[in-house]
Amino acid sequence: MTTFIAYGNINDTYPLDSIPRELLIEKLRQPQSSNQRVQKRHRCRWVAHFLLWQLLKISQKPTALLKHIDYSQSGRPQLPVHDVDFNISHSGDWVAVILRVNTQGDSIVGIDIESPQKERDYPALLAYFASPSEQAWFTQQQEKEKSFYLSWCLREAVLKSQGVGIVKLSAVQHDPLLRQIQSQHCPAGQLVFSHRLPFYLAFFINQTQCLDVHYFTWQRGILAETTLHDAIYYKVNEKT
């Protein structure tokens, strides 16, 4: 039961042509647009596909799985096997991919990254989805941005594990003091949050035992293994 996470900046150079053409999804074959936002989204897809391809090789799973990516009814990309799952997130110029291999059952993962481009009205946003106790906790925190994106990213990661949109943010109950999360929109597992990367990161894994996670970053033309410092760990849907 091993999990792999890779991230990279879309402005870096990637040998995208090295991906066999038969492993490209239809969205990557679409003609280029003159619209800059569309171009950036297209670049994010390419980088995400490249990182997923790399992680499949690292995990020793067949890269031919890329040919069979399909979409759930909610639009979540998925593989046609139960023991391998992946999820993708991008924000600003950053892309992150999570891949989990579980030889003992189903793999379910979700990931969210946020690279803030501007300061927001955090209390007003929290009022839409956080409980009064969580909002009270937030007012006592010194690092407002970090605290807000902890509350936001963990919800997104949990919901993305099932392909559920942010309309259900308020359906995720977050106890920052006990470090527990409850939601009917995901199975039991663990969530990890970090603020030590060039972006905020949260990911969910449907595993209650000790996690085995390997982190990689694309830099200078190689996918280099790295470490995650000062991570915060949560129990998700823990039985009492």
Swiss-Prot record:
Q: One of this protein's GO BP terms?
A: lysine biosynthetic process via aminoadipic acid
Q: Which cofactor does it need?
A: Mg(2+)
- Give UniProt keywords alphabetically: Magnesium, Metal-binding, Transferase
Looking up Gene3D superfamilies in the UniProt record yields: 4'-phosphopantetheinyl transferase domain (3.90.470.20)
Q: Name one GO cellular component term.
A: cytosol
Q: One short Pfam family name for this protein?
A: ACPS
Which amino acid positions bind Mg(2+), per UniProt?
A: D112, E114, E156
Which molecular function term from Gene Ontology is one that the record holds?
holo-[acyl-carrier-protein] synthase activity
- Annotated EC: 2.7.8.-
The yes or no answer to whether the keyword Glycosyltransferase is present is no
The similarity annotation says:
Belongs to the P-Pant transferase superfamily. Gsp/Sfp/HetI/AcpT family.
Q: What functional role does this protein have?
A: May transfer the 4'-phosphopantetheine moiety from coenzyme A (CoA) to a serine residue of a carrier protein domain.
Which protein are we looking at?
Putative 4'-phosphopantetheinyl transferase PM0116
